[in-house]
């Protein structure tokens, strides 16, 4: 009854107006699953390959017809008739069918669309939510949201070098309280920025993109908004950063174009440590560049016992890179992005490896998103306790938050908000 009878791929648009892949998987019993694939702006060099057409006469070369054709043709031919509940087996078949180390032949965007739609179809067939299908009966932890309320770097047209400034409501009791807290701070920040004469345009992930001179200036505005909204910085609401430092790591140095400063590897680690000391910062993602292994070890030794250090470009949701990082004492947490690796099975393997090593895991969106809310279910399914899915504006971001509200309501008394305990690695 759960045999795959049809797979339909199509080209749709993401939140930036660029094409991406959407896939429907239809089963013999009439069940159907749909998934849309996200896309990143600041991408790690070691991510699985997103296949683009390169035909400049369509979408400036960013079309995904080749990936869609792979879904409708070669992939369906290979897995049509297989049992949708055999997720690991089908994912392995897709990896072997592609035959490359980075999924570059068929495209990770084609493979991931099928992999996620497959899980949704199987859940639909069993008439259970996706988080329950993937995570079983123990899936009940609602994650602390990392809400990106100030955008910089490649996500915004402003001089701020760091890419994301986030708030984490760690001191509230429920996810719905966390969302309300974030929304109130977001709107307070809008008023404070306007009052100070800054624009309140938003970046790719829905956060404000004001012309501020430095990370410190952005953090000061956020601290003020937290207090003005009636919350206590550090107690009710903690801060998190994503410098995305690979983007400004040049010739062994960190070149801050907006600030007009250059920092050595040691100075970069010291700068992050000072920020974490001066502000209630509990998490820093990609504070060092993806290939700056010396810097990662340095900053981990320096503040890894008191601050969550998340590897995104460093690990790219890849168990080989994660295992190497664990062995060598780099970071203490991994960012989980399904499209960095390309299948649900490999995504879950990365989460499991992190847990076994005592690392935390943060489920994450990409800057180019869709209305697909799969990562909300995966955050609950894995009990990872943290989700990063943008600001409190733009419906592509709100879709994930709204799904978490539904899950919390569904779980009722069983629902448990992760709170500060989510940062167990520190």
UniProtKB/Swiss-Prot annotation:
The keyword Ribosomal protein does not apply. Disulfide bonds: none annotated. Keywords: Cytoplasm, Glycolysis, Lyase, Magnesium, Metal-binding, Secreted. It catalyses: (2R)-2-phosphoglycerate = phosphoenolpyruvate + H2O. (2R)-2-phosphoglycerate binds at residues 163, 337, 366-367, 388. It is found in: Cytoplasm; Secreted; Cell surface. It is an enzyme of class 4 (lyase). Pathway: Carbohydrate degradation; glycolysis; pyruvate from D-glyceraldehyde 3-phosphate: step 4/5. GO terms for cellular component: cell surface; extracellular region; phosphopyruvate hydratase complex. Pfam families: Enolase_C, Enolase_N. This is Enolase.
